[in-house]
Amino acid sequence: MTVQLSNLEHLPNYQITERLDVVYGSTVRSKHVGKDLFAGLKNIVGGELTAYTELLEESRQEAIDRMIVKAEALGADAVVGLRFSTSSIAQGASELFVYGTAVKAVPMQQQPIYQSSNQPPSHHSGHSQYEEPVPSAAQPSTTAQANDDLPRFNPFGE
């Protein structure tokens, strides 16, 4: 089973059917003394500290892997609201912590563009999250040119 990850509170093109629990993964890593000395020299002259970049990437992947194991144990299809946090634990050691909400999710059904009669669907045939709202008579028009001669307030002063 592949657990999908999303930093959003939802999973695009999926419907969340159940929120299971908060899941997390963490790892604590320390810097290698030799690499730390080299990084100190590199810090003086400038440039990327590749030893730290690699350490952070390895830490991030380890924390994600640990979180996924916990999500799989819950039977989750995805983890949403994914967040990372780092903190200094001791001199030269840091923790990388990742967490999110394990969820059950199913793919959304694609809405047909046209009904079988080859006519556009009416506004009452279903609701799409991307459907433009239809202005009612009670709502003022937001178009640039109004159909009447009433003065209009323009907050931009134009």
From Swiss-Prot:
Record Pfam families: YbjQ_1
Compositionally biased residues, Polar residues: 113-122
Top-level taxonomic group: Bacteria
Region Disordered, annotated ranges: 113-158
Gene3D superfamilies xref list: Hypothetical protein apc22750. Chain B
Entry's family note: Belongs to the UPF0145 family.
HAMAP family assigned: UPF0145
Protein name: UPF0145 protein Psyc_1853
Source organism per UniProt: Psychrobacter arcticus (strain DSM 17307 / VKM B-2377 / 273-4)
Organism phylogeny: Bacteria, Pseudomonadati, Pseudomonadota, Gammaproteobacteria, Moraxellales
